[in-house]
């Protein structure tokens, strides 16, 4: 088939990237990217995860095949879109969420959005390297009009995983600035409606690097009445890019889903 003859993606396929479809999978894993990130890294997890798992990765507006769409700045509006697009993805099989850094906030709010719409929660919520917004360790994010070029560069390196020589290149920073600003607005908007009690009932696992900038991951236990565990792995904020850590996380996710499936039977 010629490239021009390829079928167009559906709206949902544009929002969720599934590189390796697995109709025989028992579970689906929905992944949420870090600040400035795309969908490809987590979508590739589907290549070497167990046959039990089909992986879908959120593709945010304003990047990749959605580059023509306006960037999203508000977590509530983003979650409304994600919850709607998720319906055909999760309707046939048990599912779990995995989010890293900014993706943890989107994953949590999406789980909450599903519950508020009388939809099932994920079997398990896996969060990585994100200081809970209700924690005293939470640091205020500057307003959009307060952000300097130097601060954008900082966020690119610390939360976007961008190598220093790129993050300090003015032209690169200028190019990335709209996306980073939008993503910072999303994270900043998460500070509204902070839970004062357990709002979910699913099990939760938090991963954090031993030298991570994320703090007080223990506070995520407050948001669910389900079982909650914290695991520290060697490395910094992007500890999960280490192949050994990535393999451990994938294996742990599969084990948790198998156990959850049995206990919920």
Swiss-Prot record:
A Gene Ontology cellular component where this protein is annotated is: cytosol
Keywords (A to Z) from UniProt? Acetylation, Cytoplasm, Fatty acid biosynthesis, Fatty acid metabolism, Hydrolase, Lipid biosynthesis, Lipid metabolism
Query: Hey, what tissues is this thing expressed in?
Result: Detected both in lactating and non-lactating breast epithelium (at protein level). Isoform 2 is up-regulated in bone marrow-derived mononuclear cells of rheumatoid arthritis patients.
Q: So where does this one cross the membrane?
A: none
Q: What is its EC number?
A: 3.1.2.14
Q: Where is the active site?
A: 101, 237
Instruction: Specify where it is mainly localized.
Output: cytoplasm
The source's superkingdom equals Eukaryota
Signal peptide (residue range): none
GO BP terms: namely: lipid biosynthetic process; medium-chain fatty acid biosynthetic process
Gene Ontology molecular function: fatty acyl-[ACP] hydrolase activity
Q: Which InterPro entries match?
A: AB_hydrolase_fold, TEII, Thioesterase
Q: Where in the cell is it found?
A: Cytoplasm, Cytosol
Q: At which residues is N-acetylmethionine found?
A: 1
Family stated for the protein in its record:
Belongs to the thioesterase family.
The annotated subunit structure for this chain is: Interacts (via C-terminus) with FASN.
Q: Which PANTHER family match?
A: S-ACYL FATTY ACID SYNTHASE THIOESTERASE, MEDIUM CHAIN (PTHR11487:SF0), THIOESTERASE (PTHR11487)
* Functional summary from the UniProt entry: Contributes to the release of free fatty acids from fatty acid synthase (FASN). Has broad substrate specificity, giving rise to a range of free fatty acids with chain lengths between 10 and 16 carbon atoms (C10 - C16).
Q: What is the recorded name of this protein?
A: S-acyl fatty acid synthase thioesterase, medium chain
| Taxonomic lineage | Eukaryota, Metazoa, Chordata, Craniata, Vertebrata
